[in-house]
Amino acid sequence: MCCKCCGETQRKVWVFGLGSVFLLLGILIVVFWPGIADNLVEDGLTLKPGTDAYESWLEAPIPIYLSFYMFNWTNPEDIRNPDIKPNFVEMGPYTFLEKHKKENYTFYDNATVAYYERRTWFFDPERSNGTLDDMVTAAHAITATVADEMRDQRKIVKKIINFMLNHEGGKLYVTKPVGEWIFEGYQDNITDFLNLFNTTKIDIPYKRFGWLADRNESLTYDGLFTIHTGTDDISNLGRLTHWNGKSETGFYEMPCGIVNGTTGDMFPPKMNVNDEITIFATDACRFMNLRPRGTYENHGLTATKWVGTEETLDSGENYPNQACFCDEARFDECPKTGVVECKACRDKAPIYSSFPHFYLADQSYVDAVSGMKPEKEKHEFFLAVEPITGVPVQVHGRIQINMMIEPDDDFDIYRGVQKVLMPMFWFDQYAELSSELASKAKLAINLSSYGIIFGYSMIAFASVFLITGITLTVTKKWVRRTPEDEDILTN
């Protein structure tokens, strides 16, 4: 029997000893585990070989889709009739699976890494509404670019260019398959002529025109990125320091020309859900500020939605801090709110970007053409990011590309046409966190809580031991006597 092999003192030592040990361990866990857990999570999120973040950064672990919606210009022959608006019919989506892979990366001692990113696209017919052979009519981008570059030249120069446009295939509009409009590109007589007999006046840097021609599988198209790894300060994780080796883009006046923000695929943990976030868009050679607007639930995670607002694509009309995105010398010519000029960035072509269907843009752009139906649910640009870990949960990067067509009596092709910002296409870059990665994110979020719960459980367990010991001591019942023991004591 226990009472015969273990005395009262020994039992007290065991009960009070174990109770004290569990109590001490529980208190230590409750006090110190949150800091330890935070360090473990932050270490796993830093960009260095061996971490999960590093592996996910090297090659995107989730499918990314890029959907194109083309605008088919149905009445180009009426462009000189001021009573008839250009009419556009949306076609698509034409969806591509997008693969990202970091290459030629170099880690530096100042907690940064420089790298190129190769992006590859594969057409996904099942997610598309149409084929790449669908025909689309749109404004002739090469002709528009040449005319725009020559607009302020002397009359004699413009006469020569007008002759060239008339005899080398210059057109107001062109009809081509979707595939050629996007990645394949199409051969053009004007492009051939300018590449053969080029002058310093007109620079056409490509042999085939396509909105993303020469981009598929290109290593260098997006440029050289340098970002913070977060190894010295986790709050800097993913922040862009240089693009193509420079801290300024050279395309806009400061401070709009600064290389700022993240590339959109990595954010630091412990984000302030009341602050704006900044992403750098290489296609526009500029940063974009997104504002927090509510939350988004997915896979059991609660993410904060950061969205594009009226300020995001304003050029100073309503938000003076954005004025440096347009040339001060010709501020009166700057686009109205919701549309930004990309001419300097996009090979001098008269390209302007907006949100799809001119969502959040000045109403005049919507009214100038037929077929625009801006809707928040379909056309809002947003990133949903889990703020504790900085993990993107869902992304819809939606941008529309437009081209300016305007009259010029020195060019036969543009004589008498309406001045209109023509929608060409819009795209939606979409990605969603997988359930597997969401589970890892939830573990990281709750790791501190799990430890605290375990610590309090140990404290509760220790309390049972100690309360039991105190109770037995007060009632003097440490040794439970059996009838046999009573007989021994009474005889």
UniProtKB/Swiss-Prot annotation:
InterPro entries: CD36_fam (IPR002159)
Lipid attachment locations (S-palmitoyl cysteine): C2, C3, C5, C6
Protein name, entry field: Protein croquemort
Disulphides: C256-C324, C285-C345, C326-C334
Main location group: membrane
Pfam families, alphabetized: CD36
Lineage: Eukaryota, Metazoa, Ecdysozoa, Arthropoda, Hexapoda
Modification after translation: N-glycosylated and/or O-glycosylated.
Note: 'Croquemort' means literally 'the one who bites dead persons' in French and is colloquial for undertaker.
Subcellular locations according to the entry: Cell membrane
Induction summary: Up-regulated in response to detection of apoptotic cells.
Side Extracellular, residues: 34-451
Annotated keywords: Apoptosis, Cell membrane, Disulfide bond, Glycoprotein, Lipoprotein, Membrane, Palmitate, Receptor, Transmembrane, Transmembrane helix
UniProt function note: Macrophage receptor for apoptotic cells. Up-regulates Bfc, which in turn leads to self-up-regulation by Bfc in a positive feedback mechanism in response to detection of apoptotic cells.
